[in-house]
């Protein structure tokens, strides 16, 4: 009778492949678990809602920001050593409708 040969499993790349895959899945699961555990849900208690209402009342009395306190933006043009323009942000109102039709301003180009 012949002796049975020993099978050395670690000479094959398969255990390393599955081991690495297992570690990767474990790492992803731990990351997701930590995200779920640290996610803060807003509390729905009546005490907190009452405090939020008081904060909203104070916001109505707030003064609008004057123009001198608005942030100024410096625009440096190419080739200039000093800033040449100061820009002030402008609030643009949203359009009244999503689809604007400029049918009156159609220009016909003849070829």
Swiss-Prot record:
Q: Where is this motif: VIMAG?
A: 75-79
Could you tell me where this protein is found in the cell? Membrane
User: In which tissues has expression of this protein been reported?
Assistant: Expressed in the vascular tissues.
> Which residues fall in a compositionally biased region of kind Polar residues?
40-49
Residue ranges that the UniProt entry lists as topological domain Extracellular: 1-16
What does the entry list under GO cellular component? membrane
Could you tell me what this protein does? Probable subunit of an amino acid transporter involved in the regulation of the amino acid metabolism. Stimulates amino acid export by activating nonselective amino acid facilitators.
Q: What is known of its domains?
A: The VIMAG motif is necessary for the function of the protein.
Q: What is this protein called?
A: Protein GLUTAMINE DUMPER 6
Tell me the gene name: GDU6
